[in-house]
Amino acid sequence: MIIPFLLILLTLAACGSEKQQLTTLVFGRGSDSVGLDPGLETDGESFKVCDNIYETLVAYHSESTAILPQLAHSWDVSADQLTWTFHLRRGVHFHDGTVFNAEAMLFSLGRQFYKDHPHHKVEGGYRYWKDMGMDDILAELAAPDDSTFVIRLKKPNAPFLSNLAMNFCAAVSPTAIKKYGRDYFKNPVGTGPFRFIEWRKDERIVLARNENYWGPKAKLDRLIFKPIQEAAIRFLELSQGTVQGLDNLNPEYIDEIRDNPELQLLTQPGMNVGYLAMNMDKAPFDDLRVRRAINHAVNKQALVDNFYQGLALVAKNPIPPTLWGYNDKITGYAYDPNKARALLAEAGFPDGFETELWAMPVPRPYMPQPDKIAQAVQADLAKIGVRARIVQWEWGTYLDKVSNGEHPMALLGWTGDNGDPDNFLYVLLDKTAAVKPAQNIAFYKSEELHKVLVAARISADRDQRSKLYQQAQEIIFHDAPWVPLVHATQTAAFHRGVSGFKLHPTGSKWFHSTAFTP
C-alpha cells in the first residue's frame, strides 16, 4: 500500500533536524509506464519517468525547445552539414558506477542503428528510431577517443540536432543492457539527476536523487510516480495531500483548484493534437468520401465546450497553431451532418454502416476524458447512420494493437517532442511511418506528401521549410486520413509548497529543480 509507505517517509522527515524539509514528492498520473528503456518506449507515461533517469547529448531549455549542451559540452558541424562532432563532458558516470564516454554513446545509439549490433534485435523494434527516419539520415557513428563522439549523415537534416535531445537518443549503461538483456526496460540505468529504485506495477515507480550527479544535484530525495486512473480519485488524493502534484487534469476540477489556496494551477498552450485516425487499410475507410463524411459528422466545438471547459482549441490541422509552419488558410471540415450523410450515400452507404471506435483507457494530455470523448463521437456518428461500438484495451495493449493496424477507427494523440513540424507530420503521417508497428495508425501512404516532407527535412531555410509544411497540410486536408479533434491546453496542479517545476512545450516532466519551500 502506498499510504503507509508515505507515512513512513513523512515520519522520517519529521524526525530529522528542525531545518529538514519534506523531500519526497509523489506525482499522480493517469496510467503506469509501459517500460523504461528510452530506445523502446513511445508513450508519454514512460517518458515522464525516463526524463528524470536519462540524459542526451543535447537538451532543451527548461521553457522552450532551444537546444543547450548536456552530455556534450559543445559540438561542431562541418560546412556541408554532414559531420557532427560532439565533445563530451568528463567525469560523468552512470548510476551503476560505470563511466560515460564516447564508447557508451556509440553503444546507446549503435544498438538502434547497426543491424549486426548484439542488442539490435528487440521485440517491437526501436520504433522512435524508425519513425524519425534515423536509418535514412545516418551514415556512420564513431568514437575516435573517450571524449569525442562523431555522427556522419547521408544528407543534411534540418531537425537533426533537435532530434538528438529526444528520449530515444539517451545514453544507456552498456553494462546494464548486457546484464539485464530483455529485462532492462524495468531495470533502467542512466546518467540523470535521479536513479531508479523500484517499480511495483500499477502501484508506483520510485526514484532517488543521484548523489554522484555531474551537475547540480536534485533538490528532492525521492520522486514517486503513482498511477491513479480515475480522475476523481486523483483529484481527491491531491486535495488530501497523498500526492503533491498531478497532470492531465480533468477540466471539471479546474475551478476547484483555482479556488483552493493550498493548491496551485499551472497552464500552458499545448504543443499537441488529439485525433481520430481512420485505418485506410480497412474498408470502408479506404474511400475518401467516407473519410470526409466522418470529418463532417464530428462536432468538435461541442467537444471543446463540454469536455475541456474551454481549455482547448478546435483542430483543423495535424499540427497545433503554436508551431511554426501552421497553415491557417485551411478552413477545416465544417460540422455538417447533412453533408456527411450525402457523402456516405454517394459512397454506397445510404443507411450507414457498422464499425468499431477504439478509445484510450487512460487520460492523456490532449484528451483528459477519452471515455466521454468516445461517447460523444459515437453519438455524432450515429446521427449519420454510422453505428460504432466503443472498444478499449489496457494502455500498453492498446498502443500495440493500433500500431499493428487492428482497429478500424481509433482515438489517439501526440505531444510534440522537439518543436519542429517534422515531428508531427513525418512521424505521424509519412508513408515510412506506416510500416508496422506504426506511428502512422491511419496507414496513410501518400507519395505526394512523402516528397514534400523529405524536401522539408533537407532544407536549412526556415521560410522554405514553412512553405513546404503548409503545402503538406493541404495534402493531408484533402486526403482526410484523420479527424483532427483538439489542441489541448497543458495543465498540472501542485500543492502550494512545491516550487521549481515548469511545464514544458514538449510535455516533458523534469523534476531536477523541483523542491518544497516553507
Describe the function of each predicted region.
Residues 343, 492-518:
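Long beta-strand-rich cores associated with HINT superfamily self-processing modules
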Residues 206-209, 286-379, 445, 471:
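Append "and occasionally in soluble cytosolic enzymes with long acidic Gly/Pro-rich linkers
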Residues 73-119, 150, 237, 284:
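Aromatic- and charge-enriched surface segment that lines or borders ligand/interaction sites
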Residues 16-18, 304, 383-399, 426-495, ...:
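Extracytoplasmic/peripheral linker and loop segments enriched in polar/acidic and small residues
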Residues 61-62, 156-218, 222, 232, ...:
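Gly/Pro-rich hinge or "lid" segments in bacterial periplasmic/extracellular proteins
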Residues 18, 87, 106, 124-174:
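Surface-exposed binding/hinge segments that line
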Residues 182, 210-256, 267, 387:
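Ligand-site clamp/hinge motif
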Residues 28-79, 110, 187-189:
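N-terminal lobe/hinge region of extracytoplasmic solute-binding protein
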